[in-house]
């Protein structure tokens, strides 16, 4: 019997690492930027039936993915939100829990396409049941979606992003209708203007709401590469009046009336709007996160970057009620990644504790057993603004721990996630391989009991089926089942029925964007995901030119189809791809083939395998759609 417990920790891949916190692995392939948020959320509904965490990321093959951790049922699922996307870490997904507990996921390309994409779970709290992908058109290119719902206007979604003129932008959306469609019913509008909208000016903004009537934002004059003195400003939008105000409530502008408030990194601007400027030190300042957990004392996590960009320093910037107070936290080295003279303003990263904004987590270089490696530290600041304590959390890591993010707090323990590994660039190109990082967490990871022999009705590990070799496989009739196989579809005939059974048909639709489908009875459901990846970007010049390079067809992929409790679930290379409700199915006959290609390693079970078991089968064989 092949039985085991599946629970991957960082120590499995980095056996010499020790830490003061638990270090587990969410995924070995994932990354994010730090301006599209929330990149992860935790949600518990009022009735107590949902208590989930959702963590989103993108891999170097352009797969936008998310992990769902069900803390009540001790279950973890990894979902393929979108395949064949621009392989760029700016494109990580962001999450919004709707009033009916369904989860809405936004994503967009990096500033070279005028639209957003989104998908909504069909079941409350469960992103393994995502509906179809919907495109939301905009007039201007988009990046960094940050969605909110506020109690003063519970019937709308407020979406903030970098949009019009590369500036902070806001719009109000209708709630999803029965077809999951939303529309803009106010905006999009540019929120503010920097340096009169001059060429190349692009403020970087972080947003947070009070959950009621305000969306707070802190933003820079521009990218810190562009000028050596880069101010950081702090405002809020009153959603009832649409007014942009400073921290004391002074009106700066009315969003949407055509007159923009213009900011400048100058003494004249600060003299005119003294409390709107949160940081004016003579550095290439950048920001990582804001907190309005205490609305009267908002906090900004700031990094000061030297003129030559070689020295980074972390600060807590906090409003005291009368002024913005700066507290030094730590020297933070220089740029964290492996590529010299590129993105030298990329610090290891900071995150503010969700429950206690006096605590900030930072990634800083530390000398250890493996040389200078970025480790996580915890900084605590007193109410008076002095650094009370510094605590190192990870030790002797082989690879850098970077871009931390705190999801929520369970008692005194934050749910934290971060990237770990080598990083070369924010985009995959012929010049560099991108961001070959993993996602780690201090949360406990649910474990599946793995037994890939239990319930096995048929196995043909060395056998091959093809379009001319349609051999019927008869099995004892079962109303629960799993079919698993390694599939290789001829690239010149990339279509056809792949598996035909007495319960359903699974196939691949041809065309420039080939997508799988499953048909049970009269109901046919086509996947939102192309059966292909974005490896074509590896041959292209670095940049964001708006191109959709043709999907690269895998040499083979692992297909798993499970059925239980009236639900078909389809997994591609171990990731949830499709969810289809189909009552009353029963399996007794399987016909592999019906396409030009081969099928190997066929396994049929009389039960629905867990995703942990499916990933165990996937790891037994090589695959190229979602792995390197």
State what each model feature region is:
Residues 555-569:
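Localized edge beta-strand/strand-to-loop motifs within extracellular or lumenal beta-rich domains
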Residues 450-461, 575, 601-628:
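Extended recognition patches within non-cytosolic domains
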